[in-house]
Amino acid sequence: RPTGRRFFAWIGNNLSGNRTNLHILKIEKKSFLGGHSIIDTISFSYSDQLDFNSKHNTTSFDCEAFIVSKDSIYMFTKQWKSSKTAVYCLPNQPGHYLAKFKETLDTKGLITGATYLESKKRIVLCGYSKKGKPFLYLLYDFKNHDFLSGNKRRINLPFTFLQAEGIATKDGLHYYLTNEALIRKPVLNIPQQMHFLDLTCI
């Protein structure tokens, strides 16, 4: 979220991976607050997607997590079958593009959120396993925008069952994690919540 810009992404694709209208809206904050919004649209398709007829929740081309760095947008996909994430890159400019595949990371879970503090060169991903166990995945000490070239650390969170969905930070040390409501009566009745996480000692 660069200063002065807000990004809203329509990139979820978790049924059959067959959406053809994937896009991100970039809005100038000042224009929005002034009542005359200036909105740029960045639409895309995946450069390596050939199959648009996957069974429900088996696609490798779902995505909920992305970060913005200078002139590029980096997306971390939610690969339902493999429990991995692939990194794709888009220009941070209006237009239609092919999202370029960069690399794959075995997160052993479904990635749902990302936050990046550029000054600290640290990305924190959040997600959950197929058994509902939430986790964080830290990427740090990397070179340039080769996010997987540095250190990596997976942190299991102390929650019994939680569908983690979003993460944010101001200082790269203290984080806010949100979870989705999950109701499966009579077994589950988990409300939407926000959790504070202190990663100072990590």
Region locations from a protein language model:
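Sequence/structural signature of beta-propeller domains
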Residues: 1-202
